Amino acid sequence: MTPGTQSLFFLLLLLTVLTVVTGSGHASSTPGGEKETSATQRSSMPSSTEKKVVSMTSSVLSSHSPGSGSSTTQGQDVSLAPATEPASGSAATWGQDVTSVPVTRPAPGSTTSPAQDVTSAPDTRPALGSTAPPVHGVTSAPDTRPTLGSTAPPVHGVTSAPDTRPTLGSTAPPVHNVTSASGSASGSASTLVHNGTSARATTTPASKSTPFSIPSHHSDTPTTLTSHSTKTDASSTHHSTVSPLTSSNHSTSPQLSIGVSFFFLSFHISNLQFNSSLEDPSTNYYQELQRDISELILQIYKQGDFLGVSNIKFRPGSVVVQSTLAFREGTTNVHDVEAQFNQHKTEAASRYNLTISDVSVSDVPFPFSAQSGAGVPGWGIALLVLVCVLVALAIVYLIALAVCQCRRKNYGQLDIFPARDAYHPMSEYPTYHTHGRYVPPSSTNRSPYEKVSEGNGGSSLSYTNPAVAATSANL
């Protein structure tokens, strides 16, 4: 066989193998019954010459079955678009902007949730025997698989994007407003569509990752655009726990401090008589009259500086109405409030059938008078005063007792009858004899003058009264 014939057969064999490998859709079945289909889009361009294949294009389909212990959920509602094939013998040119999308499978021990309502892009492939020019710069997507033990949330409503093919070398704007995994997915990536790239959402969360919300107005999908091939990295793995992203309005409205002036309004209703119903706020008559007075005051003071009326009360004297009016501080005074009320008294007479007189307005510091509580009863106050008086008297008595005790220690003793016996006749005492003695403090010795001689004058120290002696002799 000549070299020319060998090269022709080699070219036909190579073309057949290349068409079978890249043109047919491969589907792999897992033990759980999961089926995943990758769709590769190709464009047909007219060509009349046969070119030598410079580089081989391989669509890497990463199809790995999960190991033992893995739980794979069967896909639901997966629909494939019809495949359109050109006629046999037509010259099909493979586009230079071909992107292969990886098929991601969970690692052993991972749990994959079902993908619902997934629509794949239409498959357009040439027939066998067609002549294809060489394809340059074809990039195969890497194999992305989730981490061991990770759990992927279900993907709902993922629809492939249409085939938009800009001119070679042009820059396609990114596609925004992409929402993946029903608005919240962990590490989800949305594939941007450029130069005939089929969009496929792949969710590859890391182990024990926390899902966070992805706003619809932001997309973080990296996109690489080249003149020969387009590679879309449609998977991202988060290896850290991400806290939930929350959007809150931190704007705070400034708080306005408003000064308030209070006025005490009192007037008489002469055409009404006070009765017991006006003493009970639960009666209908009390409530109706209070409502009429409130409406009247609100109609009289319509300006924006008027804040309200409160504490409406009734007391005898025909009917005396007492209320408290609140205004913004510095906007009005007592005279203006009284004058404005007097101007609209006729409205009360015509509309509410009330004859108002003796209007008086006074300035008060607070809208409500401080109501004293139960307080201390009268007998309690009297008892408290009595206890205080008794305590004061006891203190005075103790002070006087202490003073007397101290003074007694500094005084001597006056002995009226210094003799040891209990009775002494008067004859034993001299005329000018003092009937006592003074004992100084802390002295125990008896005075020598208090000694009385025995035998009434038998001693040399005795004294005899001659007058008394003569009288006794005469008797």
Swiss-Prot record:
Residues 443-450 are annotated as: Required for interaction with GSK3B. Sequence repeats lie at residues 86-105, 106-125, 126-145, 146-165, 166-185. Residues 402-475 are cytoplasmic. Keywords: Autocatalytic cleavage, Cell membrane, Cytoplasm, Glycoprotein, Lipoprotein, Membrane, Nucleus, Palmitate, Phosphoprotein, Repeat, Signal, Transmembrane, Transmembrane helix. The modification Phosphoserine is found at residue 447. The alpha subunit has cell adhesive properties. Can act both as an adhesion and an anti-adhesion protein. May provide a protective layer on epithelial cells against bacterial and enzyme attack. The beta subunit contains a C-terminal domain which is involved in cell signaling, through phosphorylations and protein-protein interactions. Modulates signaling in ERK, Src and NF-kappaB pathways. In activated T-cells, influences directly or indirectly the Ras/MAPK pathway. Promotes tumor progression. Regulates P53-mediated transcription and determines cell fate in the genotoxic stress response. Binds, together with KLF4, the PE21 promoter element of P53 and represses P53 activity. This is Mucin-1. The lineage of its organism: Eukaryota, Metazoa, Chordata, Craniata, Vertebrata.
